[in-house]
C-alpha cells in the first residue's frame, strides 16, 4: 500500500515539475517576443523621426524654390516646374496624414493593389523632388557663377 502512494506522489511531483518547466519555457519565449517587438518599435520610431526630418527638409527646400520662382516672371518651363512642385507639396502634405490619404486613395482596392499604389506614390514623390532640388541648385549655381 505504501508503495502505491509513493508511486502516485512521485508521479504527481514529476508532472508538476514538467508543467513548471513548460511554463518557464513559454514565459521565456513570450519575453523574447516582447523584446523583439520593443526593438521593432524603437527601430520604427527612429525611422519615423528620420522620415519626419527628411520631409521637413524637403518641404523647406520646396517652399524656398517656390518663393524663388514666385517673385519674377516665369518661362513656360519654370511654370511647369512650379506645377510639379505644387503637386509634390500636396503629396508631402498627404504623407503627414497617411490614414486619411490611404482611405481616399484605396477604396475598393485589394491588398496587392494598395501595396503597389504606395510603392508608386513613394517613387512619384521622391523622383520629382530630387529632380527639382537638383535643377534648382544647378540654376542657382549658374546664376551665382
UniProtKB/Swiss-Prot annotation:
Main location, first listed in the record: secreted
Protein keywords: Amidation, Amphibian defense peptide, Antibiotic, Antimicrobial, Cleavage on pair of basic residues, Cytolysis, Fungicide, Hemolysis, Secreted, Signal
GO BP: defense response to bacterium; defense response to fungus; killing of cells of another organism
Domain of life: Eukaryota
Propeptide residue interval(s): 19-43, 74-124
Tissue: Expressed by the skin glands.
Location of the protein in the cell: Secreted
Isoleucine amide carried by residues: 144
Leader peptide range in chain numbering: 1-18
Pfam families in the record: Bombinin
One GO term describing the cellular component: extracellular region
Family, as annotated: Belongs to the bombinin family.
Function (record text): Maximin-3 shows antibacterial activity against both Gram-positive and Gram-negative bacteria. It also shows antimicrobial activity against the fungus C.albicans, but not against A.flavus nor P.uticale. It has little hemolytic activity. It possess a significant cytotoxicity against tumor cell lines. It possess a significant anti-HIV activity. It shows high spermicidal activity.
Protein name, entry field: Maximins 3/H3 type 2
Amino acid at each position: 500500500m505504501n508503495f502505491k502512494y509513493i508511486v502516485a506522489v512521485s508521479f504527481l511531483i514529476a508532472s508538476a515539475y514538467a508543467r513548471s518547466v513548460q511554463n518557464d519555457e513559454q514565459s521565456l519565449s513570450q519575453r523574447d517576443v516582447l523584446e523583439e517587438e520593443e526593438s521593432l518599435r524603437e527601430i520604427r520610431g527612429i525611422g519615423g523621426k528620420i522620415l519626419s526630418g527628411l520631409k521637413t527638409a524637403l518641404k523647406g527646400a520646396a517652399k524656398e524654390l517656390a518663393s524663388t520662382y514666385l517673385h519674377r516672371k516665369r518661362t513656360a518651363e519654370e511654370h511647369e516646374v512650379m506645377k510639379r512642385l505644387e503637386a509634390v507639396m500636396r503629396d508631402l502634405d498627404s504623407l503627414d496624414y497617411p490614414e486619411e490619404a490611404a482611405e481616399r486613395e484605396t477604396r475598393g482596392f485589394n491588398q496587392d493593389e494598395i501595396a503597389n499604389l504606395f510603392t508608386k506614390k513613394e517613387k512619384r514623390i521622391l523622383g520629382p523632388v530630387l529632380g527639382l532640388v537638383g535643377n534648382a541648385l544647378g540654376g542657382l549655381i549658374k546664376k551665382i557663377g
